[in-house]
Amino acid sequence: MSVINDLFSNVAEFRKYVPGISANIEFAELSSSAISARKQISAIITPELWKLIKEEVTTTDAKEYLRNAFGNLIMHKSLIFDIISKRKSETADVYKHEFEAMRRQYIDNYYNAMDSLIQELTENEIYSSKWKETHDYKLLQELQIQTTADFNSYYGIDLSYLFFFRTIPLQREILLDGLGDMFTEVLSIDPARADLTGKLKLALSQLVVALALSRFDIIELPATIRSLFDDQKSSRSASDEQNRVLRLAADLRENAKSIISAVELVLSEPDESHIVSETSFNRPDDKIYLI
């Protein structure tokens, strides 16, 4: 049985979730893309949760989201082969802007479905116990930004559950690399300094996004960030896109460093709340007071 049959019984069912597929397409043509897509999604939600959702008898929200994500990711991966096949057979020709529009739509469909799926895994009791046992979820306790909403308040990620959970290891890496010590220092000096903690979280969010830009495929980025590289794509080359990605990552790192430097400056200033002067030694039981 083909991997694609994990979630789709036939092409007609597949077509319900994936727009714009050829009328004569066969599952055998999509097999290699399906293997890659299942591996990619299973790496995020774990093979155990994939199996649990796949084996559900009724059509649950989680199964619908997974079908949407799986189907659209398959087509995103196989689209280029489909177009080349049509061109070779001279049955159809697809312009570059049409190819890019289809590609973006499959990415958007996949991303939105995965966002909804991860939110469902987090909030639905049927899945949440297994989801919270995953390695990345357990790492949340070590992080300074522990929710999607909190991260989104510092750097706009379209409230993307997918992006937030994919960046858990990145946030941990940045904290272990030294930024975590600054959070500890701020709390040890004055736990009430929420302004300094907020500035450090702002810097942390920017460093996380910068690291994601250098390590993630573009389909793993929120729509707001992807849109920065999608405009006027027909007139740009792959190297142009990569340069824009690297430039944005560099800008974010520089901005984060400036914020961190400002916090370091505040922490290095002497504490003026306990000023020692001659009158500080006056005590009521002294016969002679220092004036």
Predicted feature descriptions by range:
Residues 1-71, 77-205, 211-291:
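Conserved short "hinge" loops at termini or chain/domain junctions
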